[in-house]
């Protein structure tokens, strides 16, 4: 089975910032707090919390549970119980703590299957470390549509990037997509469209250079997702694999990205047996 561990909170994610980054956040937060959407901006600020300077000289926000020094022990227990581990880590501080926990036990990365859930605000250095450790990242492109407008009111300070899917994929990270329902819409076609278009709910672009192709987004939902879950006989249609498939009313590769969420499933097949039919 798979155990879930939270390295940070959801709304109170663990960001680790320099003094310069904190000043940038304060400026954008103040500006947004007096702007036309000040109510939303102030609510976001309350949920993010106030950064605290810690002995490492960096400023940290968010909830960390368990304490970072407990993570290596938790990972070791998972390895000894033959469990995989899904670590909830939204902010760069949380992702870095997962990498440090793996580094603290030299053989741990080979003994336990670990995947990072979310990794929403990270920089190029962390992306390189995730890739070097071949750590899968399970991301939620639907968050771009559901929460992108709110998050861009007070954007993460550079060099942090918001859901940098293109950079992750190009670096060699096994990138898997999920919905995180009910936090975002369950429909995977909404997620595919979000990964390809990177538009928020108001139609504004969010770092469009981080967009994926439709084919890449579909792979993240299928083949890479199966690999991340350790399923050797799923995720692709080929001899020897399970005949798990859906029949849809449109070809996603020939459908406009904006129309992808409207694709309808006509029938579902599991192990070669039809288990659902709308026709």
Region spans (language model):
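A structural microfeature
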Residues: 266-267, 276
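His/Asp/Glu-enriched, well-ordered alpha-helical/loop segment
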Residues: 75-86, 93-114, 118-119, 124-128, ...
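Metal-coordinating catalytic core of metallo-dependent amide/deamination hydrolases
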Residues: 1-92, 100, 129-136, 141, ...
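Short, isolated positions in well-ordered beta-strands
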Residues: 12, 275-276
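Short proline/glycine-enriched turn/loop segments at secondary-structure junctions
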Residues: 255-260
């Amino acid at each position: 089975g798979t155990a879930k561990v939270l390295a940070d909170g959801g709304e109170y994610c663990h960001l680790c910032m320099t003094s310069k980054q904190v000043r940038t956040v304060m400026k954008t937060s103040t500006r947004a707090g007096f702007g036309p959407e000040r109510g939303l901006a102030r609510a976001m600020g309350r949920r993010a919390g106030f950064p605290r300077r810690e002995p490492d000289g960096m400023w940290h926000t968010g909830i960390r549970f368990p304490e970072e020094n407990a993570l290596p022990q938790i990972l070791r227990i998972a390895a000894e119980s033959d469990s995989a581990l899904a670590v909830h880590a939204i902010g760069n501080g949380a992702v870095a703590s997962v990498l440090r926990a793996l580094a603290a036990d030299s053989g741990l990365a080979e003994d336990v299957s670990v995947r990072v859930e979310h990794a929403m605000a990270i920089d190029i250095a962390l992306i390189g470390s995730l890739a070097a450790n071949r750590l899968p990242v399970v991301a939620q492109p639907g968050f771009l549509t559901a929460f992108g407008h709110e998050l861009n009111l007070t954007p993460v300070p550079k060099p942090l990037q918001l859901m940098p899917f293109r950079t992750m994929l190009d670096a060699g990270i096994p990138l898997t997509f999920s919905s995180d329902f009910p936090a975002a819409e369950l429909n995977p076609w909404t997620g595919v469209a979000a990964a390809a278009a990177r538009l928020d709910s108001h139609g504004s672009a969010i770092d469009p250079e981080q967009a994926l192709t439709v084919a890449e987004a579909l792979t993240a939902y299928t083949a890479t997702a199966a690999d991340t879950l350790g399923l050797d006989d799923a995720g692709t249609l080929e001899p020897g694999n399970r005949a798990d498939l859906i029949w849809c009313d449109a070809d996603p590769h020939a459908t406009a990205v904006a129309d992808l969420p409207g694709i309808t499933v006509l029938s579902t097949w599991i192990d070669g047996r039809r288990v659902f039919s709308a026709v």
